[in-house]
């Protein structure tokens, strides 16, 4: 019997970090054949050519460049158009039995649309979540409706997919994909981090990731400058920045951060891509995470590291007690709360809702192996 071909598509470093262990599970199974397509920011020098991280462990089946030089609305639309055409050709060539994508990126909306029209079963990871301050929210729900199997990180997100009419037999709550990564991570100590980053970490460490405001792009420059102004007031601080993603105004944010770090090289450094080991090791020892990244919401709870979450970009996602939500103009109050006795006490006792003790990648792989492909495309809509 021929092996079932599973095609994993990844466009960003954040996606790959969560998909990597699943790829190992698939590759090590005698009944499955792994295909990997790298696209989007993975192939961009601006974002660190992160496809090279994939190639350290896997053979990339196809590389599909779709990013244009600019990141305005028109360029993003044209990138989606390029993706639609290129993935049509890729899937016609590879003939995958199933395609697996993660999350809510605009690139994946093109991939999902191609799968729909080509009658390829689509598996969606991390659906059912909310990010009401970003266009990602609409993209995520749209992808879910075009998908045939769903693997979510919490029961709340499972219920939301059922609200969208999905059949319960197609939706699996597997907990956070980050859980096994973090539990099995060989963390770097501070000395090893200093060597790897070429930076002294003898001050209070802040890990900062700030992405574009896709529903409020006009305020992006103002908000990032307001954040940097606040960071300038921190005494005895080491500031580690990671680059913004490939959304509209991502390049603008990265240029501002680059200039800031050059002027403040004694305390600040910007990285294209830290990689999961360095990133999680920094998260573990940081005084706080700052920004509007989903990792601050869903991964910092594993370490009980405080996270100052700025603005509405992650609005709607499940919160834990280590999260301090703040508007950009209320950062003084957020840092006051960070130092409060009550907040520090709460950090000791909260339960992480993203860790349910399961091995998510084994669950996904088992479903990919055993699902009936003859009937999977025929979906029902379940009314509440």
Swiss-Prot record:
Its EC number is 3.2.1.184. It is an enzyme of class 3 (hydrolase). GO terms for biological process: bacterial-type flagellum organization; carbohydrate biosynthetic process; UDP-N-acetylglucosamine metabolic process. Coiled coil: none annotated. InterPro entries: UDP-GlcNAc_Epase, UDP_GlcNAc_Epimerase_2_dom, WecB-like. Keywords: Bacterial flagellum biogenesis, Hydrolase. The keyword Cell membrane does not apply. Transmembrane segments: none annotated. It catalyses: GDP-N,N'-diacetylbacillosamine + H2O = 2,4-diacetamido-2,4,6-trideoxy-alpha-D-mannopyranose + GDP + H(+); UDP-N,N'-diacetylbacillosamine + H2O = 2,4-diacetamido-2,4,6-trideoxy-alpha-D-mannopyranose + UDP + H(+). GO terms for molecular function: GDP-2,4-diacetamido-2,4,6-trideoxy-alpha-D-glucopyranose hydrolase/2-epimerase activity; hydrolase activity, hydrolyzing O-glycosyl compounds; UDP-N,N'-diacetylbacillosamine 2-epimerase activity. CDD domains: GTB_UDP-GlcNAc_2-Epimerase. Involved in biosynthesis of legionaminic acid (5,7-diamino-3,5,7,9-tetradeoxy-D-glycero-D-galacto-non-2-ulosonic acid)(Leg), a sialic acid-like derivative that is incorporated into flagellin via O-linkage to Ser/Thr. Catalyzes the conversion of GDP-N,N'-diacetylbacillosamine (Bac2Ac4Ac) into 2,4-diacetamido-2,4,6-trideoxymannose and GDP. It can also use UDP-N,N'-diacetylbacillosamine however it generates small quantities of 2,4-diacetamido-2,4,6-trideoxymannose. Belongs to the UDP-N-acetylglucosamine 2-epimerase family. This is GDP/UDP-N,N'-diacetylbacillosamine 2-epimerase (hydrolyzing). It comes from Campylobacter jejuni subsp. jejuni serotype O:2 (strain ATCC 700819 / NCTC 11168). The gene is legG.
């Amino acid at each position: 019997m021929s092996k079932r071909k599973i095609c994993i598509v990844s466009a960003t470093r954040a996606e790959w970090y969560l998909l990597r262990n699943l790829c190992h599970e698939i590759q090590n199974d005698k009944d499955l054949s792994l295909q990997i397509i790298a696209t989007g920011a993975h192939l961009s020098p601006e974002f660190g050519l992160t496809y090279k991280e994939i190639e350290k462990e896997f053979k990339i089946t196809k590389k599909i460049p779709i990013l244009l030089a600019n990141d305005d609305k028109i360029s993003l639309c044209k990138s989606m158009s390029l993706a639609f055409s290129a993935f049509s050709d890729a899937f016609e060539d590879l003939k995958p039995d199933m395609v697996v994508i993660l999350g809510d990126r605009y690139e994946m909306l093109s991939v999902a649309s191609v799968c729909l029209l080509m009658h390829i079963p689509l598996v969606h990871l991390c659906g059912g979540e909310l990010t009401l301050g970003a266009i990602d929210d609409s993209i995520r729900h749209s992808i879910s409706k075009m998908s045939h199997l769903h693997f979510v990180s919490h029961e709340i997100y499972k219920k939301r997919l059922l609200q969208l009419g999905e059949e319960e037999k197609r939706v699996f709550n597997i907990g956070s994909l980050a859980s096994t990564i973090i539990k099995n991570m060989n963390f770097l100590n501070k000395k090893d981090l200093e060597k790897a980053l070429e930076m002294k970490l003898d001050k209070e460490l802040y890990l900062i990731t700030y992405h574009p405001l896709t529903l409020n792009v006009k305020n992006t420059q103002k908000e990032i400058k307001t954040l940097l102004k606040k960071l300038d007031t921190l005494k005895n601080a080491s500031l580690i920045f990671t680059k913004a993603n490939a959304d509209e105004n991502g390049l603008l944010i990265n240029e501002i951060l680059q200039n800031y770090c050059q002027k403040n090289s004694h305390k600040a450094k910007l990285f294209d891509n830290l990689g999961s080991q360095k990133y999680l090791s920094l998260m573990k020892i940081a005084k706080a995470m700052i920004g509007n990244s989903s990792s601050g919401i869903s991964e910092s709870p594993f370490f009980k590291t405080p996270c100052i979450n700025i603005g509405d970009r992650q609005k709607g996602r499940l919160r834990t007690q280590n999260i301090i939500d703040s508007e950009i103009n209320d950062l003084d109050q957020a840092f006051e709360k960070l130092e409060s006795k009550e907040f520090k006490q709460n950090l000791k006792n909260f339960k992480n809702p993203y860790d349910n003790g399961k091995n998510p990648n084994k669950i996904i792989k088992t479903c990919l192996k055993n699902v009936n492909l003859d009937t999977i495309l025929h979906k029902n809509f379940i009314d509440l």
